[in-house]
Each structure stands twice: as C-alpha cells, then as structure tokens.
Amino acid sequence: MLIHLIRHTTPLIDDGICYGQTDLDVTDSFEAERDIILSKLKSNYDAVFTSPLIRCARLAESIQAPKRFSDKRLMEYHFGDWELKPWNSFKTQDQRSWMNNFVEQAAPNGESLIIMRDRVLDFWLELEKANYKNVAVVTHSGVQRLIHAHVLDTPMNKIFRLGLSFGAIMEVNSSLEDELLTIRHL
C-alpha cells in the first residue's frame, strides 16, 4: 500500500503560540499552498483520511477519492491548559518538568506523547490491514513524526529532530507480505 501522510497548510495563528488540538482555520495563502501540495500527489487514491480539525479537513476536501473518513485519532497532540499560550511563557515548574519528560508526562489537562502514540498507532495498524492500494492521510506534524518513529523504530524522545514544514508530504510504501516499509519525503 502506498500511503501519503500530508501535513496541513499554514494555520491562522501568530508565530510562537502553542495550538495542538485548537481548531484553527488556515491563512489566506491556503489556495496557493494547496495547489503546490496537489501537484505532488497522485490522482488515484482509494481513500482519504483526515484529522477533523479545520486546517486538515479543508485540504482533504481538495483530494479526490471515492472514500473519505474523518478520524479523531489523527488529531495533533493535546496541550491542554497550554493551548493558545505563548511558548515563551512556559516558565512554571510544571512546564519545565514536562519539557524534560514530554514522552511520559502530560500537559495539564492534556495528553502524554505515549497516549498520543497509542491512538495514532491504533489508526496506523488498522490502516495497514485495510485493502487499499493508494491512500492519502491529511494530518499534523506530531502524527507524522510518530508514524515515522514507528516505521523506523526511532525513540520517541527523538521525534522533534525531524523537521516538517506546512504541507510536508511523507510517502510510506507498506508491504505486509514482505515486511518492508520505506519512507521518502516529497
């Protein structure tokens, strides 16, 4: 199965603000960004899966496929009480503690990276068993990084070493018969 993991376009929010699962719209550059992304994609997808957040759903609407699915498991990391707060304001003991152990520790009223990984891999393992040839998945950088880490068996505390710009496309070629997974970045 050929799977394109596509990061959403630029969200409508100031730089330096923590936004995770906040449902943000996209900027005025959406159409131009969308057209660039679409020029890199296939035209014969069997299905499109998307995070339900607007910044993903808008892009997913532009990708042609006979089947469409919105799936909460594809949502970004939930930063809880820190959503919509400036990153540079994270000076409390809770925030310092979280930054030192973001894999296991949840943001207040949010989720840990382990919880996020479990929901993302639940989706991923289900998708790998599905009977599709070509699939597009419109999602967030956190989801892309976790799938990348899973496929390459990378420790979760290293996932932020992978830089992903808005509109980044990862292509995963999955063959369960050969137990072979390859990734390339488009």
Segments the model singles out, each with a brief description of its role:
Residues 41-44, 127-133:
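Glycine-rich phosphate-binding loop signature in dinucleotide/nucleotide-binding domains
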Residues 63-119:
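Phosphate-handling substructures
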Residues 141-145, 168:
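GST superfamily/GST-like fold recognition
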Residues 3-66:
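Active-site-proximal alpha-helix that buttresses catalytic centers in soluble enzyme cores
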Residues 3-4, 131-141:
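Generic beta-sheet signal
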Residues 50-51, 118, 138-139:
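Short beta-strand scaffold positions
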Residues 182-186:
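Short, solvent-exposed aromatic-acidic interface loops
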Residues 155-180:
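Domain-level recognition of soluble alpha/beta enzyme cores
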